[in-house]
Regions:
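Structural and coupling elements of P-loop NTPases
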Residues: 1-201
Length: 201
């Protein structure tokens, strides 16, 4: 649970065969508790009994109506394979009336919605979902392209060094290993760090 607190985004993987299970619900509640933006991937779609649509509907009913199928996206360059789903338009139009206007006059595409979608994902008002198979690789590249396209952070390398220590353990020789996620600046091998604080550098 401590590790979850340093995540910028999370990818929650759900089986396309078994659907939402007990551990899925537990993870979802923890992600909501720490207000972590979530991308969803429905896995095992290469199996005969897998059902993407059924699992997607279950996620919308059990987790949030803001879970939205993003399968119409095809690449990271703004070339999208289909029309923007009405569900996505309605969610985005709550904050941006111009999106609804563009949708009604037929000029709307995902490339024109990118900033709105990034903001919605980051604030937990949209949970993008795609499907595929980790075993065969089907859908993985498309999902990662979507993730890189819409997952953004504010960290800057030129800022003063700061970070959060989220785990400390010892290796087989008894040496202490400290796991840190940086939230600003940069650090290199053999750098010395001064001015430590509890849970922070």
């Amino acid at each position: 649970e401590r590790t979850l607190q340093v995540l910028d985004y999370a990818v929650l993987v759900i089986s396309g065969r078994e659907g939402v299970q007990g551990h899925t619900v537990t993870l979802w509640k923890l992600l909501q508790k720490y207000e972590i933006p979530v991308f969803l991937f429905i896995n095992k779609l290469d199996r005969d009994t897998a059902d993407y649509e059924a699992v997607l509907k279950s996620l919308q009913e059990r987790f949030s109506p803001a879970v939205c199928d993003m399968s119409f996206l095809t690449d990271s360059a703004g070339t999208d394979g289909g029309s923007v789903p009405e569900q996505l338009v309605m969610l985005a139009a709550e904050d941006h009336e111009e999106i609804l206007e563009q949708y009604l006059d037929g000029t709307l595409n995902a490339a024109g919605m990118e900033e709105s979608l990034r903001s919605m994902i980051r604030s937990g008002r949209l949970y993008p979902c795609m499907g595929g198979s980790a075993a065969t690789g089907e859908g993985i590249d498309r999902f990662l392209q979507m993730f890189y396209r819409f997952a953004v952070t504010d960290y800057r390398e030129e800022d003063p060094l700061r970070g959060i220590v989220y785990k400390v353990r010892h290796d087989s020789q008894g040496e202490r290993l400290t796991f840190v996620t940086l939230t600003g600046g940069q650090i290199s091998v053999k750098d010395s760090v001064d001015g430590e604080k509890v849970h922070q550098i």
